Amino acid sequence: MLSAPTPMHTVSSQASPTQQARCLLVLLPGFSDSDTDFDQHGFIADIHARKLSVDTISANATIGYYAKRTILGRIETDVLAPMRAKRYEQTWFMGISMGGLGTILVAQQHEKELTGLILMAPYLGDDDVIDEIAKAGGVAKWKPPAVVDPEDYQREVWRWLKHATANPTTSPAIYLASGDQDPLARGHRLLATAVQDGHLFRTRGNHDWGPWRTLWANFLDTSDFRTRCAP
C-alpha cells in the first residue's frame, strides 16, 4: 500500500543560525526518492557553499500523496502555512521528476505567492498529451480544452504552463533543467521553446542524480536566483 503519512515529514536547513534568510526554497523529490536525498546528493551543501540567503525545506512528498490526492493539502498545511508567518521575501519551489509535476500543481493553486519554479527533469505528462501539443506546433499554438477538467490533470498542467510562460511578468519565473538523454526529454523540449532566455539549463546525461547535480550547480552559478537570493 502506498504511504502518505500525516503530517508530511520535512527536513529544514537554515542559511544562518541567528537570522532568517531572504528566500525560502521548498524541494520536492522524484518518484523513488525522499526528502533526505537532496542533502545526501549535495544540493543543500551547494547552496551553503555559495553563501546564499536561502533557507530550505525538503518535503517527503512521495508517490503516496499524489495517488491519494493529498499532496496539495499536505504542502499547504505542513509547508506553506507555517512559513507564511515568517514572511520570507521570496518563496521558491524546486522539483525533480515527479516533484517537478508537484511543483507545477502547487503553482496552479499558489501562483501569487511564488517567486519562481525550478523544474528539473520534470514529468510533464504521458505520450498522448505530449504528442497533442507537439502536433499543434508547440505550447504557444496549442489550444487547451475549452472546459477546465481537474480530472485531466496533465492537460491542466500544460494549460497553466501555457498561461505562465505567456505572462512572465505576472507569473512565477520558470526555470527548466534536464539532461539531453532523459527519457522525458520530449516534454522538456516542448517547454524549452516557451521559457524565457536564460532560464534553460542543459547537460549531457540521463534521468539520474549525476546530471541533476551538474544542472543544479549550473543553475546556482549562472541564473538570477543567485542575485535574487544574495545576502
Regions picked out by a protein language model, each given a short descriptive name:
Residues M1-P231:
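Non-catalytic cap/lid and distal C-terminal segments of serine-dependent acyl enzymes
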